[in-house]
């Protein structure tokens, strides 16, 4: 009998959502390059911040770090801001918005989850 949970743990769901957010943000940033309309500047900056915070969140969760919840709390704030900003833009930005919104939700869940006892 398989003893693994039927559903991913909040930590695993957060890692997966963060990885998808990283892919979405990197994809759109590679598409727009360095020449983009001025009204996209905030979205570009928030995508960059989301990538960094998601990378750190994934690393801290993977290491079962004692600061994983705090890292995820910050990641949730940045990803939510990115999602809100990207939702106002056309085309591929809507995909980014959805990915960041999902990462924000999963990170928020981890931030509110009691720490694992190893």
Functional labels for PLM-detected ranges:
Residues 1-118:
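Amphipathic alpha-helical hairpins
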């Amino acid at each position: 009998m398989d003893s693994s949970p039927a559903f991913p743990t909040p930590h695993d769901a957060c890692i997966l959502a963060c990885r998808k957010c990283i892919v979405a943000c990197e994809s759109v940033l590679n598409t727009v390059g360095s020449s983009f309309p001025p009204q996209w500047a905030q979205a570009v900056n928030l995508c960059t911040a989301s990538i960094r915070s998601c990378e750190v969140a994934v690393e801290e969760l993977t290491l079962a770090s004692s600061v994983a919840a705090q890292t995820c709390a910050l990641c949730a704030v940045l990803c939510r801001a990115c999602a809100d900003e990207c939702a106002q833009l056309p085309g591929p930005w809507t995909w980014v918005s959805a990915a960041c919104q999902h990462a924000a939700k999963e990170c928020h869940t981890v931030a509110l989850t009691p720490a694992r006892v190893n």
